Amino acid sequence: MVTRVGDVFLLLGLVILFNTFGTLRYSELFNHPDLFNPENAESVKWATLCIFGGAVGKSAQFPLHFWLPDAMEGPTTVSALIHDATMVKAGVFLVARTYPLIVLSPDTAVYIAVTGAVTAFVAASMAMVMNDIKRVLAYSTISQLGYMFLALGTGAWAAWHAADHGLEVHAQGYMAGLFHLMNHAFFKALLFLGAGAVIHSVHTQDMREMGGLRKSMPITSTAMGMGVLSIAGFPLMSGFWSKDEILESVHKNGEYDGTFGALWWLALLTAAMTAFYMTRLWMMTFSGPETRVVEKMVKSKDHSETVSYTHLTLPTTPYV
C-alpha cells in the first residue's frame, strides 16, 4: 500500500507531461521545441515533483521509507541482489533518467536534495538503535539512497544556477550520485551476504546474542570488515570517493545558498553516524567473548562465498 502512493504520484506526473508535450518518449521530450517555453515552466515543475513522488515510494524515501525494513524477510542473498543492487535503486535511476527535465525546475531540485538529506539522517538515526542485523542493513540502505538523491538534487540546482554563479562543475552532483549508486550495490551486497553467513551459523538475527565470531568465522569477519570500511567512507575505499564527491558538490552549492549549507552539515553528521552504527554492527557481531548462543550453534566452517565481493570494495582508483 505504501508504494501505491508513489505509483499514484508517478501516474500524475506522466499525465501532466503527456498533456503538456504530447509524448512520453525521452528523446522527444528532451528535444521538444516547447520545453523551454516559460508558459510550460509550471507544468514541468509539477510533473517533475510528481515523478519524484514515484521515486520516493520506490526507493523508500521519507516519509514513505518504513516499508523497506519489513521487506527484508527473504534470504539475504535475495536482499543482496534485489533490495540493494537493483529494485530499490529504480527510483534513483528514474530521477537520473529524467534529469534534463528536473534541471529546468530549481524548486524540484531543492525538494529532492532536502528529501534525500532528511531521509539519510532519519534512517541513520534508526540504524543506530537497531539490534536486528538485517534491519540495521535495511535502514542503512535507506540512508544511502538518501545520499544519492541529495547528490542528484544538488547537481540539478547547480545546473540551473550555473550561469548565475559560475558553477561550471554542475555535473559533479549527478556523477557523484550515480557513482555512489554503483559503489553501494557492491559493498552493501557484500554486507548482506556476510550477514547471511552469520545468521546461517548462529540461527539468530539479534546482534545481542552474537559476539566473538571473529575467531570461528575469520573470512566472513574480514569480508564484512571491508564492507564496513567502505560504507563508512574510510580513505581509499570505494565509498570514500563517492561520499567525498557528494559532500563536495553540496558544499559548493552551500557557498551560494544557505539551504545547501545546512544540508552539507546534515550530510556530514549522517556520514559520522554511518561510521558509528556500522562499526557497532561489526563489533557486536565479531568482537568480544563468544556468547552462549554462539558457542552452541556456530559451526567450525567459514563461508567464503562473500570473499568474491570483497575486492569490489577495495580502492577504485581507475574510476576516479
Language-model segment annotations:
Residues 1-312, 318:
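...captures the hydrophobic TM-helix bundle architecture rather than a specific catalytic motif
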